Design a protein with these regions (language model features):
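Active-site C-terminal subdomain of aminotransferase-like
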Residues: 188, 193-275, 289, 358-360
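Conserved N-terminal alpha-helix of the aminotransferase class I/II PLP-enzyme fold
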Residues: 33-79, 86, 100, 108
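Conserved PLP-binding catalytic core of the aspartate aminotransferase-like
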Residues: 284-314
């Protein structure tokens, strides 16, 4: 069977070149005589892998030296608890709720202190991003938390909060590595890797040095950022295969794509094709305010739920899989992450037009 176009929100597509390299090295990595999945995390081969992966991430994202990088088990959801456990030093934090995951992060933080929801776009079913310059932030907040791209509702920030003396913490799971990011605007960036980086099973956190070392003594060892970051992610056995795959994807981004500036141009061109089609007809609709439309996750609906269901079924038969929208919003969602080729978007639009003509 031919490979399909996978529009899943995550786990999602990986570059075919990366998959083929992993396939070629599956049984024996280099001269190790073993697979990366088998080797000791203390071996010289894996030591080189993890160091090279971090170094490549630092180059690709231009991460300053005063930030530490860590590879964590537990995914981004575990970070929802780690953030307040490590950073909520005043007992308070500000949260901007723009979708499901930022809401879950706020609820988790409320277990450990005051999680003040200072702005929300729930009033319009999360179809926009609040004006970050008009939000009444709390000066005694330990940090401000955002989810920079909203996978379920298909929105993204066009600018981020900048409050003097209050660090910004961002969940970038569904937009990381899709475009350049000024890391210096953030105290902490974290992301699950299964959307735009690697297979499921790991999160990466980028933390500014001055935010470390303030967790209470009763914070569990493995929930303390300092535990892993001061041991270069080797306090215990790390998610070795995910780290290896992350390294391959980063090298692909750096060498084949040419970096994040080029990746952004490619992604914006793909998204434009899909949004231009949606705006040019009336059968399919996208509810998001234009300024805040996500480049990564494009949501749309047909005239009724029955047609939505029919569309997803026929799309899957045609080789376009995982287009069903999240249960919270219904409809369809095309996640067009880095690895989705432009031809996949072009062919999806052709299929959408065919479906429209047959069902309008």
């Amino acid at each position: 069977m031919a490979r399909v176009y996978n529009f899943s929100a995550g786990p999602s597509m990986l570059p075919e070149k990366v998959l083929r390299q992993a396939q070629a090295e599956l049984l024996e990595y280099g001269d190790s005589g073993q697979s990366v999945m088998e080797m000791s995390h203390r071996s010289k081969w894996f030591d080189a892998i993890i160091k090279d992966t971090e170094a490549t991430l630092r180059r690709v994202m231009n991460i300053p030296d005063n930030y530490k990088v860590g590879f964590f088990q537990g995914g981004a959801t575990q970070q929802f608890a780690m953030v307040p456990l490590n950073f909520m030093t005043t007992g308070k934090a500000d949260y901007i709720v723009t979708g499901n995951f930022s809401n879950l992060a706020a609820k988790e933080a409320a277990k450990f202190g005051e999680a003040n929801i200072v702005a929300s776009s729930k009033d319009k079913n999360f179809t926009y991003i609040p004006d970050v310059n008009a939000i009444p932030y709390n000066q005694d907040a330990s940090y401000i938390h955002i989810c920079q791209n909203n996978t379920i509702f298909g929105t993204q920030y066009v600018e981020v909060p900048q409050v003097e003396g209050v660090p910004l913490v961002a969940d970038m799971s569904s937009m990381i590595l899709s475009k350049p990011v000024d890391v210096t605007k953030y105290g902490c960036i974290y992301f699950g890797v299964q959307k735009n980086v690697a297979p499921a099973g790991m999160a990466i956190a980028i933390v500014r040095d001055d935010l470390l070392g303030h967790a209470a003594d009763n914070v569990p060892t493995m929930m303390n950022y300092t535990t892993l970051l001061n041991k270069d992610s080797m306090y215990n056995t790390p998610p070795c295969w995910c780290i290896y795959m992350t390294g391959l994807v980063l090298k692909y981004l750096e060498n084949d794509i040419g970096g994040l500036v080029n990746m952004q141009k490619i992604n914006e061109a793909k998204a434009k094709v899909l949004y231009d089609y949606l705006d040019g007809q009336e059968f399919f609709t996208n509810p998001v305010e234009h300024r805040y439309r996500s480049t990564m996750n494009v949501t749309f609906t047909s005239p009724n739920p029955d047609l939505d269901k029919k569309f997803c079924a026929e799309a899957a038969e045609a080789g376009f899989v995982n287009l069903k929208g999240h249960r919270l919003v219904g409809g369809m969602r095309a996640s067009i992450y880095n690895a989705m080729p432009a031809e996949g978007v072009d062919k999806l639009v052709d299929f959408m037009e065919k479906f429209r003509k047959e069902n309008a």
